[in-house]
A protein has these predicted regions:
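Active-site residues of response regulator receiver
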Residues: 8, 52, 80
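Two-component/phosphorelay signaling modules centered on CheY-like receiver
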Residues: 11-29
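Acidic catalytic/metal-coordinating carboxylates
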Residues: 32-36, 59-62, 83
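Short amphipathic alpha-helix used as the core "switch/output" element in two-component signaling
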Residues: 39, 61-73
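Active-site beta3 strand of CheY-like receiver
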Residues: 44-50
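Receiver (REC) domain active-site loop signature in two-component systems and cognate sites
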Residues: 55
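C-terminal output helix
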Residues: 104-113
């Protein structure tokens, strides 16, 4: 179960998305602008953000940058009702995990959310795996020396 923040200035999105995403087993927070979204993001343990790209005052790309300043590991999915190659490229270059066009196909949204959360969980395990590698590298000389000593003792 993940905590997902949905940010959009469209009331329909803020009403539809939570009920659908809740059915998938996730908790949903909503915000109608970037400033409220940042407050929620800082107050709660948010695992993933779905945000509109065009919003008044703070657009989705500005919100993306601020979220990345706080937590570089948090996936952000960008929504737009005005698709263009340039906006998709800009969003991806800015660090968005994915880019979806409105009206959103909910099967596609579910898939993108699941893939982004899986990627985030894999990234969380990297420091542990690096530590495990170091532990193995450090322990190999110890076991070699111990093996040599035991071999000499058993002769």
């Amino acid at each position: 179960m993940a905590n997902i923040l949905v940010v959009d200035d469209e009331k329909d999105i803020l009403e539809q998305f939570p009920s659908i995403i809740n059915r998938w087993g996730h908790n949903v927070f909503t915000a109608s602008n970037g400033f409220d979204a940042l407050q929620i993001f800082e107050k709660h343990d948010v695992d993933l953000v779905v945000t509109d790209i065009r919003m008044p005052d703070m657009d989705g790309l500005q919100l993306l940058q601020k979220i990345q300043d706080i937590d570089k590991q948090c996936p952000v999915l960008i929504l737009t009702g005005y698709p263009s190659d340039d906006s998709a490229i800009e969003a991806m270059h800015s660090g968005a995990d994915d880019y979806l066009v409105k009206p959103v196909n909910f099967d596609e949204l579910k898939l993108r959310i699941e893939k982004s959360l899986e990627r985030k969980n894999r990234m969380k395990s990297i420091p542990f795996l690096k530590g495990l590698n170091w532990a193995l590298l450090i322990s190999i000389p110890f076991w070699l020396i111990l093996g040599i000593i035991l071999a000499k003792l058993l002769r």
